[in-house]
Amino acid sequence: MKKKYLLILIFLLAFFLRFYKLGQVPPSLKEDEVAMGYDAYSILKTGKDQYGKFLPIIFRSLDDYKPPFYEYLAVLPIAAFGLNDFAVRFPSAFFGSLTIIIVYFLVKEVFENQKFKKWGKGIKAEDIALLSAFFLSISSWHLHFSRAAFEVTISLFMLVLAVLFFYKGFKKGKFFYFSSLIFGLGLFSYHSARVVFPLILISLVLTFQKKLFTKYKKEMIGAGLIFILIFLFYLPVMFSPEAQIRFLVTNDLQFDKAQEASAKNLLVDQKLGSSFWGRIFHNRRIAVFNWDNLYKVSTNYFLHLTPEFLFIKAGFPMCQVPGHGLISFWEMPFLILGLVSFLLFFLNRKTFIFLFWFLTGPLPASVTWQAPHPVRTMLFLPTFQIFI
């Protein structure tokens, strides 16, 4: 019973830190927040965005073509509180606070009834869950983005909830349907979700495939159909000109050099009489995976794991607490010790998802020219807090 009170206190702390003077701190809305707020207000009043498009599934915004979830979620608080800073930031603070509770239940669900090695045997799942929730509640990384209008805060909430429902499905099969639904809808929540959500879902299915397709075959068919239907609806969005513009503006891959190399190789193939195999191995899509691009992506990936990015500066002044890293210095020894302990004593089939989640987090930002990027990698969380 006492631990339930601790959870309530942790949630109240998280709620206070995210809502206290939300309309004043940070001072003034930044341009992205203004655009999202005005789009939400326009939807409320006219059903159209600021450019006159009726109920769009991609918001043109500042010509950066945003996913739709945040704008639609902001409609209700703007209707209730008016068009102001507090109302625009309300969805981020609200779902950021709820994420703390969901993380608690996820960690408890995953670590419950597990047999761990050596000294890990005496640790209770509820204790790990409470500590994870507490560290996330005071995380400067999560707190910073929960106090401003960032789509990634909503996306992280959906990801944690989808994984929780997946594990709940082993107790009640109907939760697989909810998990699949949220994994699918999450694709519309943030650009990075297009990479992270499917990879997390695939990892979960492959990890438990034997159990899923024997004991829960009916649920898997239903859940699969739900995700496929949503994904089919999402495909036109993913390949729309607006989405392509967003990708071309942010990516760091050298398409021009790849296409030039592809054209040269195809000419050589034609002269050698091997045009069939040339079309397979030297086409412009395969050519993108050249050594220059692979080196750039891998370098960007590991930049997100450096102490400088995590503990000193995040690279963008507006994306971090001034004079403070994404993770506090005092958390460093606990993070290192926790990660080593997890790998040695707590890693098994059921907990593997946290390691995979941790490794998947930097992928979306690794192909962009602004790497390392704290917003595009925020789906990293809450693995850091779980390891701590």
How would you name each of these model-derived features?
Residues K2-K296, N300-I388:
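Membrane-integral, polyisoprenol-dependent glycosyltransferases
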